[in-house]
Amino acid sequence: MVHLGPKKPQARKGSMADVPKELMQQIENFEKIFTVPTETLQAVTKHFISELEKGLSKKGGNIPMIPGWVMDFPTGKESGDFLAIDLGGTNLRVVLVKLGGDRTFDTTQSKYRLPDAMRTTQNPDELWEFIADSLKAFIDEQFPQGISEPIPLGFTFSFPASQNKINEGILQRWTKGFDIPNIENHDVVPMLQKQITKRNIPIEVVALINDTTGTLVASYYTDPETKMGVIFGTGVNGAYYDVCSDIEKLQGKLSDDIPPSAPMAINCEYGSFDNEHVVLPRTKYDITIDEESPRPGQQTFEKMSSGYYLGEILRLALMDMYKQGFIFKNQDLSKFDKPFVMDTSYPARIEEDPFENLEDTDDLFQNEFGINTTVQERKLIRRLSELIGARAARLSVCGIAAICQKRGYKTGHIAADGSVYNRYPGFKEKAANALKDIYGWTQTSLDDYPIKIVPAEDGSGAGAAVIAALAQKRIAEGKSVGIIGA
C-alpha cells in the first residue's frame, strides 16, 4: 500500500563517534521531539478511552465509532463462493473467495493500481467506472464460460462511511489523500452497483465493510481468540466487537430481534483521534503536514503514525536541517523540495541499509534526488528515520491498548494487517514492546505477552466474503440487518 519492497537482513549499526558536534546536537534534538516515553503512551491511551466512549454516545465525538452491522460472530462453518473488492489507498484488489466451512478459505486475486490522478479527479463517475472495469476484467479471466448464478460481492471500502444497514455506506469524508467531489455524504453502494449493472455483470453488492472490520472478521473466522482487527498501512485504524447495549447512539433504533447482548462490529476510524490536539506530542513537522493537507485539523492521529505520512515527515525534517545549513551544503535540492516526493519506502530502505557507511542510502539520495551525502549526514538521516518509524509504532498501539482496556480484555490476539506492519523494518517488535510498556508486563519474549499482535488473515478479501455470508444468512432467516426502517 505504501510501496515497501521485500525485506532485507537487519542492518548493521555504524558508530556515531565520527559525527560532528553540530550534527550530534541535531540528532539529540530529534531524539527529544520524536521519542515517546511510557508515561506519554499511558496518557495518550487514557485519553483515547474517553474519546472512544464519546464516539459511541448519542452526541458523538472526534472518533466516529461506526457500527458495521456485523451482528454475529463467525462460527467458522460459513461456506460458499464470494467475490470481494478492496478499495484501499493505492490499489484496487479483486478477490474470489472460497470459504471452506472448516475455518479455512482459498482466495484467487488480482490487483489493479489506481492512477495517482484518480485520487483527486473532478469526475466522481471515473472512480466507479474504473472499479467496474477492473471487476469485469477479473470475472472474464476467472469465469471464461460466464456465470450461471449471481455471485454475492462484499465491498471493502476503507474510508469513513456511516451505515444504517450492511449494504450501504455513506461516505463521511475522504482520507489517504483522496478528494473527489460529489461523493461525500452520499451512499457509495448504488454508485458502484450502477456501473456493475451497466456492464451486465451478474453481481450484487450485499455488504459494504471497512478493511479493518474485514481483518477482524476474517481473523475471527480462523481464530476465535481474535479481539481486534487493526491496520497499519496507508491509514491507521482498529475494529472490534462491542455489545449493542453499550452503544448509546443505537438505543431505540434496533429491531426487537436484536437483543441488547448482541455483538456489533465497530469500525472505529480512530485516525481522527485527538483532532483537538490535547494529548498527542506533535512536532513542527506534524503541524506543517496538517496545515498543508487537503483537510487541515482532521486525521491528526493518522498524520503522525500512518504509512502515508512517514516519508514526508522525514523529508520535512531534512529540509529544515538543509535550510539551517547543517546538511547538503551548496547543493541543488529542487528535486527534493517537493511535498510527498519521499514515500514510506524511503525511510524503510534507509533503516535496513546493511552497510556500515550506509552505501544504499548514499545511492538512494544520489539516484533519486541528485544529492551527494557524507557518511555523517547519512548517519543523521538513518537515526532520524529510526526515530520517526519508532514513534509511529509506539503511538499506533495506543488504540489497541485503549480498546482492550475499555472492553476488559486481559489476553487475546490482535490481528494486524497493512504494508507498514508487514514490511517496515522493526515495526512489529517496536509495536509489541510499546504495548508491554503501556501495561507494564514483565515477560521478556514477544510470544509470551498476554495480548499479542499477530499477522491477520486475508483481511479485506476473506473478511468481506465472511461478512457477506453472515449478511446473507440473516436475510434468509428474516432477521434485521440495520436500523429500523433503513
Curated annotation (Swiss-Prot):
The record ties this protein, via CDD domains, to: ASKHA_NBD_HK1-2_fungi
Listed transmembrane segments = none
Q: Which domain of life is it from?
A: Eukaryota
Asked if the record carries the keyword ATP-binding, the reply is yes
Residues the record lists as Phosphothreonine modifications = 38
Molecular-function GO terms, alphabetical: ATP binding; D-glucose binding; fructokinase activity; glucokinase activity; hexokinase activity; mannokinase activity
- Where the record annotates domain Hexokinase, the positions are 21-469
Which Pfam families does this chain map to? Hexokinase_1, Hexokinase_2
Q: Which residues bind ATP?
A: 86-91, 111, 307-308, 344-348, 419-423
Activity regulation reads: Subject to allosteric control. Substrate inhibition by ATP.
* Residues bearing the modification Phosphoserine: 15, 158, 245, 272
Q: Which residues bind substrate?
A: 158, 175-176, 210-211, 237, 269, 302
Q: Which SUPFAM superfamilies match?
A: Actin-like ATPase domain
Coiled-coil annotated spans: none
EC number per UniProt: 2.7.1.1
Disulphide bond pairs: none
Residue ranges for the region (Hexokinase large subdomain) are: 210-458
Q: Which BP terms in the Gene Ontology apply to this protein?
A: D-glucose import; fructose import across plasma membrane; fructose metabolic process; glucose 6-phosphate metabolic process; glucose metabolic process; glycolytic process; intracellular glucose homeostasis; mannose metabolic process
Q: How does it assemble?
A: Homodimer.
As for what it does, the entry says: Catalyzes the phosphorylation of hexose, such as D-glucose and D-fructose, to hexose 6-phosphate (D-glucose 6-phosphate and D-fructose 6-phosphate, respectively). Mediates the initial step of glycolysis by catalyzing phosphorylation of D-glucose to D-glucose 6-phosphate.
> Which protein family is it in?
Belongs to the hexokinase family.
Q: What is this protein called?
A: Hexokinase-2
Could you tell me which species this protein originates from? Saccharomyces cerevisiae (strain ATCC 204508 / S288c) (Baker's yeast)
- Which gene name does the record give? HXK2
